[in-house]
Amino acid sequence: MKHKVKVTVIGKKLYPELQQQYCADPNSGMCPCYNVGDEFIFERDEQNDHFWHGGLNTLVKTTADPNTVAGGPKMPHCSEAWDAISRYIYTGLQGGSIMKGRMKHENEMICCCSDGTRPVIFKVERIDEE
């Protein structure tokens, strides 16, 4: 059985009071790297190894210019996001249970990047193919 992993941006948050208090640019705003609804497909086989390349060119759906989205053809995933999602992507690509017992479906995980003033929320989903 072959496995792919789909990552979807399902939310973006902003905490302006924290940006005002702690950020060098107190008006930095929402994360510029991702958009709600962005979708990425990761494969790892003889032709592709998206995991090894930090998710470069895994973007399959966006409402923005693909060249400006992390994971698009021009830039790999943001390091803060990659740190949050890569372990689940790797597990899914190997056919493993992403979060058995915690999530309703063991092939899914909801996680977010570690930017505390403007986190991005991701759904990571293992897709099983014959």
Task: Please provide the spans of the model-predicted regions.
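Short, Lys/Arg- and Gly-enriched loop/turn segments at beta-strand edges
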Residues: 47-80
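Short, structured beta-strand/loop micro-motifs enriched in basic residues and often containing a Trp
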Residues: 3-5, 12-25
